[in-house]
Amino acid sequence: FRDLWTKLREENYAIHPIEELENSDLFKFSPFKTLTPDQYETIETIYKRLEQEHEDAKHGGSKRERITVVSGAPGTGKTILAISLMFKIKNEPNLSDLRVGFVTPMDSLKKTLRKLTHFLPGLKPCDILSPSDVTKNDRYDILLVDEAHRLGNYLSMGSGIKAFYNTCDRLGLPHTSNQVDWIFKCCDKAYLFYD
C-alpha cells in the first residue's frame, strides 16, 4: 500500500503523505482495514453463529446466548473488530434485516464514528449510540458495545444522576441498576467488548 500511495503522490493523484492518511479517523476505524488473522476469525465465528441463530429463529427455533463478551488488552483492535462486525451484518443479505446498533460510552468516539458513517455503505449516524440513546429507541436485535468496561452506574453519574434515574424509571429498573442493565433491557443479543 505504501508503494502504491507513493506512486499516486508522484502522479499527483494523492496529496497527503501516507502518515497523515494512516492517522486519519477514516483509516483507523474503517471496516475495510485489513484485520489480523485472529480478528478475522473472531468476526467469522460470530457472524456464522448469528447467521445460524437467525435462520433457526425464522423456523421457530429458540434464541441462544444473549450475551457474548469479547475481551482483549487495550489497543488490540476490539473497536475495529466491532465496527467491522457491524459493517458485515449491515451489508450481508442474510442478516441485513436485523436492527443493529454500535454503542460506546465515549462521546468523542461516538461523534467520530457518526461522521464516518457517511463514507460507509449500510451504516447511518443513528446506528452509533450512547448508552442513553439505546433506551430512547425501539428494541434492537443486536447491540455491539465497545468499551463496555466504561459503562456506568448511579455511583459514577455525578451531575447526571437525575437523568440516570429517569432512564431507570422509564425502563422499569431500580435506581441501583447500571448501563449494562439498560443494554440488556433494550436488545435481544449483546456483544460486550471489554478490556
Residue ranges of each PLM-predicted region?
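The feature marks helicase ATPase cores and/or their adjacent C-terminal helical subdomains
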Residues: 1-195
